[in-house]
Amino acid sequence: MLTIHTYFDSPARSDGSQKWVDFASTYWHVDCVRKMSINAFIDHYENWCKRKKYNFSKSKAEEIYGKAKELVPVLPKDDITKLIIKQAVDQLNSASITVESLRTLMNETASKLPEYPVVMAMKGVGTSLGPQLMAEIGDVSRFTHKGAITAFAGVDPGVNESGSYEQKSVPTSKRGSSDLRKTLFQVMDVLIKTHPQDDPVYQFLDKKRAQKKPYYVYMTAGANKFLRIYYGRVKEYLASLPES
């Protein structure tokens, strides 16, 4: 029904379940929605959310219902169509369970690293992106200064004629670790979506966006600032630990 995944942005749960997939399993045909009255659908959707322990939004229900009323069904609402949808849902759930199991394993492995608590306390980082960052950056002591770690990621701003760093316009570099840059961009995306007002990286991103900087400029500049803070916090924390 519709491109239903675009209506839900909830992350997958630890058991692999996803709201949009569960929705598609219940409302497997557009007629499952549009044949109801709007009030009946809202009530049905609210009860479904309670039963599945998902957040309910009346405006979201109204949006979905309005879109469903505009659509013309391509496939008939019959047992064959229902079977096709069920098989697709089962495959999606199976893949999601595997992914979430791997994420759990990654997090358990990363939790044994000494820098784990300080990295996980950073805004924009969670049980998925945190372990990715630690794996891709490795031991921060191998970087002699903050500029070395940003160069490693390919988000260093470069040097101006006076020899000092210039951050007015920061393009994405083709050098460095593309995997780390991707993870850093994902962290920036989380910050933009969650907008933690007290976070210095988000404040910096918000300022650059307000200045109408191009997407890759403000994302790379934000990644640069995040990495510098990461480097400083992790080094300081590790230095404070008693020697083993």
Can you name each region flagged by the protein language model?
Residues 1-244:
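A detector of single, family-specific signature residues
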